[in-house]
Amino acid sequence: MISALFSRGADGVPAPAPLDFATLQLPASPNTCLLTPSVAAGQGHLQRDPLPASPEAVMAALDRVAAGMERTYPLARFPARNQAQWVVRSALMNYPDIIVAEAAAVAGGTGLWMYSRSLIGWSDLGVNRARVMAWLEALEAALRAG
């Protein structure tokens, strides 16, 4: 993990793999935030009703959102899962956090799963929750704008 602190962008973080939201087990540490669709069973910290856009449109809008976020770098894309991952670096200490998003058709529209987690430390002082809420707000605005 030390290399993650001295790296830039997406360098230095563990090799990405697709995240299976159906089997995700949240850690005991308070340094994550999971958003799940309100129509899906799960253990999310936050829920969101289905979005009124296709999964592809949601992911395209999320790509635009991520591109506009400071210190955010693409990490991986898994098209078969309609999933993308990014590294977000803290301004002061360069700590890397990972954010994973996946969109899928659900009853009533498109369900969004978003998981933001710290790679270093026990507590994040609410940073991951604030990030998920900010990304969700920006995504909703991007979808409204078309």
Write out the residue ranges for each language-model feature.
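Ser/Thr-rich, low-complexity intrinsically disordered terminal regions
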Residues: 2-146
